[in-house]
């Protein structure tokens, strides 16, 4: 590895599925690595055994692949700096825990959760910021040893705490936020680096892993800023170089103005949910990258390769990024328009199957008919599930005519136009869009009705809608039999209402 090689990582916890915020972290690290011809590493931080879910890791990796991300090292690929799961690195962490203890920079703490809670409550009552108070204050080494042995005899299990240097000031030049500074006293006292079950805490394990995996830059969310001084303290204690840090802005709900929270049910927040709705991965990438990063110029639609080429971490925003679902829908619609009919049909197929609009083993003719329906409406939809409402009328028959549509049928010429068109459809040996268009033009010529007064009654009679894609194509896909049935129904209604 060259001295200046860029190495970044995305390190998810398998405690849940891929969240929008975490997907953004993965994307920004990926873009930085690929733009700088560096390495992108996946590491699974699975030390929180109580919260890990069974398919958490698989789900994370599967959704990253769906987004088009590839990585150079990881739990599924291996690499020179593995293992890439923290649960498989416990012996490595234990080695460095012992090194810190041997240096007097870490120690065993036997305070119970109840004692710690009582300490916090007393501090709050005294209007102090809650912090850990050294439990061995004023004790000699022999007294400390005796106290620890007594705790062991009671069956208490210790945590290991890192001894924070009291007068230290932790400073770094953040790649996003600029100069940052924390005084040691603001950290909250000596913090835990190993839990009672022997597992390392996040702040300890991440330092060991990032150093041994030669991570050069750490891009992560703004909520990790307060972790940085703790991690810097461990780097310094072990005599290691600190990587460069960049903390990305918060994502807020544009409707509430509040930080996007996993508990906020008003917003879909997991990549899996957008996949299920039939969003395109390229659109999700595009939308997420624009949450806190801005390209030069007015254009907003770019492929992942284009983002890699133009990426500049200096254009990461310090201000919160607004999550706007309508903006996502607009971006996805742009990609729907750019995609081929086959690509959109592939994405829409699960939605059509779930809605019972087609069978998995449907004959080739019906498959092609459905593909053409999807092609007809692909410019109209924001995401694939919306195709269901557009296709349903062609399979199950149109919905009832709206009051708006009924008002359009009050024109005196409506019945004349529909009857004339019905006669021409009935006379067709083969009905396609070209023939339908010719028939409409023939009706215009014979009835002298044109424009909206010609097209609107025909659209409403066949589709029961006042707007939609090209009418000849729609009529072709309804087919001659259904089209005649719809026209006859409308003629009967209009004659009855005369």
Curated annotation (Swiss-Prot):
List the ranges annotated as motif 'KMSKS' region. 259-263
| Single Gene Ontology MF annotation | zinc ion binding
Group of enzyme by EC: ligase
Q: Which Pfam families match?
A: Anticodon_2, tRNA-synt_1c
What's any one GO cellular component for it? cytosol
Which UniProt keywords are given for this protein, alphabetically ordered? Aminoacyl-tRNA synthetase, ATP-binding, Cytoplasm, Ligase, Nucleotide-binding, Protein biosynthesis
User: What is catalysed by this protein?
Assistant: tRNA(Glu) + L-glutamate + ATP = L-glutamyl-tRNA(Glu) + AMP + diphosphate
* InterPro entries attached to this UniProt entry: aa-tRNA-synth_I_cd-bd, aa-tRNA-synth_I_codon-bd_sub2, aa-tRNA-synth_I_CS, aa_tRNA-synth_I_cd-bd_sf, Glu-tRNA-ligase_bac/mito, Glu/Gln-tRNA-synth, Glu/Gln-tRNA-synth_Ib_cat-dom, GluQ/Sye
Subcellular location(s) per record: Cytoplasm
Listed binding positions for ATP are: 262
**What SUPFAM superfamilies does the annotation carry?**
An anticodon-binding domain of class I aminoacyl-tRNA synthetases (SSF48163), Nucleotidylyl transferase (SSF52374)
**Would the keyword Transport be found if you checked this record's keyword annotation?**
no
- Motif 'HIGH' region: chain residues: 12-22
Q: What is its EC number?
A: 6.1.1.17
Q: Which domain of life is it from?
A: Bacteria
Does the keyword Ribonucleoprotein belong to this entry? no
Gene3D superfamilies (UniProt xref):
1.10.10.350, HUPs
Oligomeric and partner information: Monomer.
Family as reported in the entry's similarity comment: Belongs to the class-I aminoacyl-tRNA synthetase family. Glutamate--tRNA ligase type 1 subfamily.
NCBIfam families for this protein:
gltX_bact
Protein name (record): Glutamate--tRNA ligase
* Species annotation: Limosilactobacillus fermentum (strain NBRC 3956 / LMG 18251)
């Amino acid at each position: 590895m060259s001295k200046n090689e860029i190495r970044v990582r995305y390190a998810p916890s398998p405690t849940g599925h891929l969240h929008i915020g975490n997907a953004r972290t993965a994307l920004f690290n990926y873009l930085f690595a690929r733009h700088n011809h560096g390495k992108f590493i996946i590491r699974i931080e699975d030390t929180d055994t109580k919260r890990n879910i069974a398919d958490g890791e698989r789900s994370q990796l599967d959704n990253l692949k769906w987004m088009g991300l590839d990585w150079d090292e990881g739990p599924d690929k291996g690499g020179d700096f593995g293992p890439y799961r923290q649960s498989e690195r416990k012996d490595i962490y234990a080695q460095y825990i012992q090194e810190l203890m041997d240096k007097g920079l870490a120690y065993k703490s036997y305070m119970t959760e109840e004692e710690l809670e009582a300490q916090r409550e007393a501090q709050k009552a005294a209007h102090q910021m809650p912090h850990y108070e050294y439990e061995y204050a004023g004790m000699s080494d022999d007294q400390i040893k005796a106290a620890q042995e007594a705790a062991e005899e009671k069956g208490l299990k210790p945590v290991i705490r890192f001894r924070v240097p009291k007068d230290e000031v932790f400073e770094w030049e953040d790649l996003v936020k600029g100069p940052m500074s924390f005084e040691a006293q603001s950290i909250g006292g000596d913090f835990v680096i190993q839990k009672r079950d022997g597992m390392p805490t996040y702040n300890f394990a991440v330092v060991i892993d990032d150093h041994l995996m030669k991570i050069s830059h750490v891009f992560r969310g703004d909520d990790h800023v307060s972790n940085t001084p703790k991690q810097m303290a461990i780097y310094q204690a072990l005599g290691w170089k600190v990587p460069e840090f960049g903390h990305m802005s918060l994502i807020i709900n544009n409707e509430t103005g509040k930080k996007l929270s996993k508990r906020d049910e008003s917003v879909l927040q997991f990549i899996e949910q957008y996949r299920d709705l039939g969003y395109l991965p390229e659109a999700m990438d595009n939308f997420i990258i624009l949450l806190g990063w801005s390209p030069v110029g007015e254009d907003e639609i770019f492929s992942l390769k284009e983002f890699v080429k133009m990426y500049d971490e200096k254009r990461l925003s310090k201000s919160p990024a607004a999550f706007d679902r309508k903006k996502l829908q607009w971006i996805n619609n742009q990609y729907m328009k750019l995609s081929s009919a086959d690509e959109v049909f592939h994405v829409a197929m699960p939605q059509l199957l779930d809605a019972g609009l087609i069978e998995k083993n449907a004959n080739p003719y019906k498959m092609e008919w459905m593909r053409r329906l999807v092609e007809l409406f692909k410019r109209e939809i924001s995401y694939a599930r919306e195709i269901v409402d557009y296709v349903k009328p062609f399979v199950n028959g149109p919905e009832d005519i709206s009051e708006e549509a009924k008002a359009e049928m009050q024109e005196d010429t409506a019945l004349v136009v529909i009857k004339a068109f019905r006669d021409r459809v009935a006379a067709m040996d083969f009905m396609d869009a070209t023939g339908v268009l010719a028939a409409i033009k023939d009706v215009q010529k014979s009835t002298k009705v044109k424009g909206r007064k010609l097209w609107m009654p025909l659209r409403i009679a066949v589709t029961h809608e006042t707007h939609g894609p090209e009418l000849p194509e729609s009529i072709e896909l309804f087919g001659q039999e259904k089209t005649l049935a719809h026209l006859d129904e409308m003629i009967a209604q209009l004659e009855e209402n005369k």
